[in-house]
Design a protein with these regions (language model features):
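Short amphipathic alpha-helices in soluble, non-transmembrane regions
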Residues: 30-32, 70-78, 111-118, 144-151
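Ordered, amphipathic secondary-structure segments that act as subunit-interaction surfaces
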Residues: 64-111
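Single conserved hydrophobic/aromatic residue that forms the stacking wall/gate
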Residues: 1-13
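Short, charge-patterned binding micro-sites
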Residues: 41-64, 87-93
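Conserved short beta-strand edge segments in small beta-sheet-based binding/regulatory domains
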Residues: 79-91, 120-127, 152-166
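Short, low-order "capping/linker" segments at domain edges
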Residues: 93-114, 135-149, 166-190
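Short glycine-/aliphatic-rich beta-strand segments at the starts of folded cytosolic domains
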Residues: 14-20, 55-61, 92-104
Length: 190
C-alpha cells in the first residue's frame, strides 16, 4: 500500500482526558498548543473535578497513532497539565448534549412525541416554540436534529463530548503524566 493510504487507514477518533490546574488561562494554553501544531479539535468540554483545584478537559480529535502520541507528549510538557490519558474507545462512557429550539405552531404534540422517542425533554415551551434538551452519543444527537429540521430549527447548540473510563479505573495525578489504552490504535512505545 502507498504510505498515504496506509496512514489514512490507521486514522482513528480518540478522546483524551486531561486533568489541569483550575486556573485562569489554562484552557488558552492547551488550545494554543493544538493550534500552534496544526491539530484540529473535533470536540472540547471543560469542567471542574471532584477536587476544585483541578479541571478535566475532554478533547476529541481524529488522528493517526503518531499524532496522538505527539499530542500527549506535548500536553504533558505544559506545566498546568497534571495528567493526560487517551481513553479506551470501547471502555469509556461518553455523552454530549444538544439544545434545539424549534418552531412549534400546530405541530406541538407531534414534536413532543418525536422528542420522546429520543428521550429528549422540553425545557422551554412558548406559544410559538419549544426548546428540547437531548443527551447521548453523537449519532443519536445527529438523528434527533435531523428529525427536528423539517419543523424549522430556530436555534441550536451542542456541547463537547464528556467522557470517563468505565469501571474502577481513575486518573491519578500522582502517577504517569500520560497513558495509553490497550487497543489497536496504541503506539508501540511512549
Amino acid at each position: 500500500l502507498h504510505p498515504r493510504v496506509r496512514r489514512q487507514r490507521q486514522m482513528c477518533i480518540r478522546d483524551r482526558s486531561i486533568v489541569v490546574r483550575n486556573q485562569p488561562g489554562v484552557l488558552m494554553r492547551v488550545a494554543g498548543m493544538f493550534s500552534r501544531r496544526g491539530f484540529n479539535i473535533d470536540s472540547l468540554a471543560v469542567g471542574i473535578t471532584q477536587n476544585p483545584e483541578f479541571s478535566r478537559m475532554t478533547v476529541t480529535m481524529q488522528a493517526d497513532d503518531a499524532t496522538i502520541k505527539q499530542v500527549c507528549k506535548q500536553l504533558a510538557k505544559l506545566v498546568e497539565v497534571e495528567a493526560v490519558k487517551v481513553l479506551p474507545p470501547k471502555a469509556s462512557a461518553k455523552r454530549s448534549m444538544v439544545m434545539v429550539k424549534v418552531h412549534a405552531g400546530d405541530k406541538r404534540l407531534e414534536l413532543l412525541r418525536l422528542a420522546d422517542v429520543f428521550r429528549a425533554h422540553a425545557v422551554d415551551v412558548t406559544g410559538e416554540s419549544l426548546i428540547f434538551l437531548a443527551t447521548g452519543i453523537d449519532d443519536k444527537l445527529n438523528a434527533f436534529v435531523d428529525v427536528m429540521r423539517p419543523y424549522g430549527i430556530l436555534e441550536m447548540v451542542q456541547t463537547g463530548l464528556v467522557a470517563l473510563e468505565r469501571g474502577d479505573a481513575a486518573m491519578d495525578v500522582s502517577k504517569s503524566r500520560y497513558s495509553w489504552p490497550e487497543s489497536s490504535c496504541k503506539p508501540s512505545a511512549i
